[in-house]
């Protein structure tokens, strides 16, 4: 189960990064959207090596700023189990 959760979180990070890059939004700009001053916060999340991940408030802010639904950033559970 823990392995599936890690994969699920990895997929969320990947979806957010894909949407960020598609919109030419830098890590700094995304960090500022999330209320942080440094791009290091987003870099830590995107590398998934520091046990930091997006929370629901982050996903709401990202979806709002990107003009998409929160559900666009969340993978289907069945996809995460493969």
PLM segments and residue spans:
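Recognition helix of helix-turn-helix/homeodomain-like DNA-binding domains
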Residues: 36-52
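A short, Lys/Arg-rich alpha-helix, primarily the initiator
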Residues: 1-23
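Short, basic-rich loop-to-helix N-cap that marks the start of a DNA-contacting helix
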Residues: 24, 48-64
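Conserved hydrophobic/aromatic packing and binding residues within compact polymer-binding modules
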Residues: 16, 27-31, 42-45, 73
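Short, charged recognition helix plus adjacent turn
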Residues: 1-6, 64, 72-82
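The alpha-helix within a helix-turn-helix
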Residues: 20, 31, 63
């Amino acid at each position: 189960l823990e392995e599936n959760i890690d994969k699920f979180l990895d997929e969320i990070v990947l979806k957010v990064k894909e949407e960020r890059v598609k919109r030419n939004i830098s890590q700094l700009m995304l960090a500022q959207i999330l209320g942080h001053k440094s791009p290091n916060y987003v870099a830590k999340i995107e590398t998934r090596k520091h046990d930091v991940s997006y929370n629901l408030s982050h996903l709401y802010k990202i979806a709002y700023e990107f003009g998409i639904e929160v559900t666009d950033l969340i993978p289907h559970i069945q996809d995460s189990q493969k």
